[in-house]
From Swiss-Prot:
Testis-specific. Detected in round spermatid cells from stage II-XI (at protein level). Expressed in germ cells from mid-pachytene spermatocytes to mid-round spermatids. It comes from Mus musculus. Residues 291-617 form the A to I editase domain. This is Adenosine deaminase domain-containing protein 1. Its main location: nucleus.
Length: 619
């Protein structure tokens, strides 16, 4: 399949080709060039990464997608999670038994499901209502719990704003048991979904009425789940769409200008712009680029357990790690206790929580000059008819993928319990993960609530639709997972749109393996060789003799320790290693385990976990 960068997805070898699988895989996947020992490099992991796996036949795949009675399996944690040695209480009760190898949701949705026997609704516990009133349960999670207890169907659907509301507002409404409730508005999807859930719950629990309602014997029927869109609403929707597109085009131009300024004295790196990704912060309508990354490779050499090597230098991953550096700076502004500095920070306190959150009217955008590798590049002509070969192709396209030496392979060919070479999940899969866990990662989750992307903008230079990205991010994980997630976590649905490309796509043979990074506050670009994970000699910024990138794990741990001191959270400083500090973030690890179990249970495959020894270092 042709990728957005003009390259083709690496063919995934399988038994149906009639050739041994190992003959087609690179050395790091256990192919013919793989060696048993790590030449000249110390490593504590010698596990054989490749395991023999058979792809089920098309008939088996179809059989799997037929509706079956739900089974009451014993609850277990995902295999990959146990290898991380993170001990969390009560997590197992939220994770279901893992079954299957291929995704079925999109196929099975087209088939009739066997209805469950009608069960009476459960009585709402007073404790649940009181917790919701006190703000201890976020509205979206509370509404999902309400629907489960009352045994009714729930859908939080995007709609159009009502009345004469103009501007870049998002609108959602809750549909509970076929009845549509009031529309919630917000500057971003998270806020509007939360407001919609609150409006519905307040009415369902009668919290907005001083006296109990008296049901009238007759009256107008409930609002239908699929309301008729009036010409006025259609006009408002059109105005909003056009307004957003103008705004998005300005953001694309802003990204172009920012990157252009950074390489003004380094024009030899202009072709690196083909893979450009950037994060943009919106404050009260004003936009600023805060993090930039480029790159198309990942480190796939032998393990070096010192935390000073960059493992994944794909553009969106590099931009996200640059964003983390921006977050650390913003948090240091907040903890400075200087009122003027705190005012500049994007973070603030929130009642009933010891975690900081983004200030009101602050939104996060992601711009990508091309589609990320993996499921986002699904062929637009694929059809999900279970009687066609396209259904089999779709199962492969929608599964989790691993990036090896810049190419993409299905995780079904990989062992999920650690490897002696470093390989990373595809950028599409990481985006899927961030839309549940947030972009902040485990370390920053000690200080802030999850931060979600409001909108994803894709340059149209070599892309004419975002169907694959929509499926990878907005359809692989169901909204129902939100009710199982810890406080503040949810299944986010970013708005996805094609925009004018910031830079035309170019073939970059001279600097193919290079990755550029920058975060707001940096004086210059840093250039990393993605193949060895170190800074290049020609990089405008150099950290020291070790040539370790400012994005590496060791650098992040150093910033984490500094922030913990400023925030006076001495308990966090007791973590002996980088790995231990991550595992101390209980809610984040719980949410991660639930997501991994969900993906595996629904047939998308196993999330490949890097060897634990990579994180067993300290400063």
């Amino acid at each position: 399949m042709a990728t957005a960068g003009g390259s083709r997805r690496a063919p995934v070898p399988g038994p149906r080709l009639g050739l041994p699988l190992a003959a087609h895989l690179p050395a790091s996947l256990g192919g013919e060039g793989a060696k048993d020992s790590v030449g000249g490099e110390k490593t504590s992991g010698n596990n054989d990464w490749f395991q023999s796996s058979r792809v089920p036949s098309f008939a088996q795949m179809l059989k799997k997608n037929l509706p079956v009675q739900p089974s009451a399996q014993t609850v277990t944690l995902p295999t990959g999670y146990s290898s991380e040695s993170c001990s969390l209480s009560n997590m197992a009760s939220k994770v279901t038994q893992v079954t299957g190898n291929f995704p079925e949701p999109l196929l099975s949705k087209g088939l009739s499901s066997i209805s469950n026997p009608v069960l009476p609704p459960k009585k709402l516990p007073k404790e649940f209502i009181m917790k919701y009133k006190r703000g201890e349960i976020n509205p979206v999670s509370a509404l999902h719990q309400f629907a489960q207890m009352q045994r009714v169907q729930l859908d939080l659907k995007e709609t159009v704003t009502t009345g004469n509301v103009m501007g870049p507002y998002f609108a959602f409404c809750a549909v509970v048991d076929g009845i549509q409730y009031k529309t919630g508005l917000g500057q971003n999807k998270k806020e509007s979904r939360s407001n919609a859930a609150k409006l519905a719950l307040d009415e369902l629990l009668q919290l907005d009425e001083p006296e109990p309602r008296v049901l009238e014997p007759a009256g107008p029927p409930p609002i239908p789940a699929e309301p008729v869109v009036t010409p006025e609403a259609a006009y408002v929707s059109k105005v909003q769409y056009e307004g957003r597109q103008v705004q998005y085009a300005k953001i694309s131009q802003l990204v172009k200008e920012t990157f252009g300024q950074l390489i003004s004295n380094h024009s030899q790196y202009l072709k690196c712009s083909s893979s450009l990704a950037a994060f943009i912060i919106e404050r009260a309508g004003h936009h600023e680029v805060v993090a930039i990354g480029t790159g198309e490779y990942n480190y796939s050499q032998c393990i070096k357990p010192n935390g000073r090597v960059l493992h994944d230098t794909h553009a969106v991953v590099t931009a996200r790690r640059s964003l983390l550096r921006y977050f650390y700076r913003q948090l240091l502004l907040f903890y400075s206790k200087n009122p003027a500095m705190m005012e500049k920070s994007i973070f603030c306190t929130e009642p009933a929580s010891n975690l900081l959150t983004l200030k009101q009217n602050i939104n996060l955008y992601l711009y990508m000059n091309q589609l990320p590798k993996g499921s986002a590049q699904i062929k637009s002509q694929l059809r999900l008819n279970p009687h066609s070969i396209s259904a089999f192709e779709a199962n492969e396209e929608l599964s989790l993928h691993v990036a090896v030496e810049g190419k993409i392979y299905l995780t079904v060919y990989c062992s999920a319990d650690g490897v002696n070479r470093v390989n990373s999940m595809s950028s599409s899969d990481k985006l899927t993960r961030w839309e549940v866990l947030g972009v902040q990662g485990a370390l920053l989750s000690h200080f802030i609530q999850p931060v979600y992307i409001s909108s994803i903008l894709v340059g149209d230079g070599n892309c004419n639709d975002t169907r694959g990205l929509e499926i990878a991010i907005n359809q692989r994980v169901d909204d129902a997972l939100t009710s199982k997630l810890p406080m503040f976590y949810l299944v986010n649905r970013p708005h996805i749109s094609l925009v004018p490309t910031a830079y035309p796509l170019q073939i970059n043979l001279d600097h193919k393996s290079l990755s550029l990074n920058w975060a707001q506050g940096d004086n210059s670009l840093e250039i990393v060789d993605g193949l060895n994970g170190k800074i290049t000699e020609s990089s405008p910024f150099k950290s020291g003799l070790s040539m370790a990138s400012r994005l590496c794990k060791a650098a992040m741990l150093s910033r984490f320790n500094l922030l913990a001191k400023e925030a006076k959270t001495d308990d966090l400083l007791e973590a002996r290693t980088y790995h231990a500090a991550k595992c101390m973030s209980g809610p984040y690890q719980e949410a991660k385990a639930l997501l991994k179990a969900y993906l595996q249970q629904h047939g998308y495959g196993s999330w490949i976990v890097k060897s634990p020894c990579i994180e067993q270092f300290s400063m």
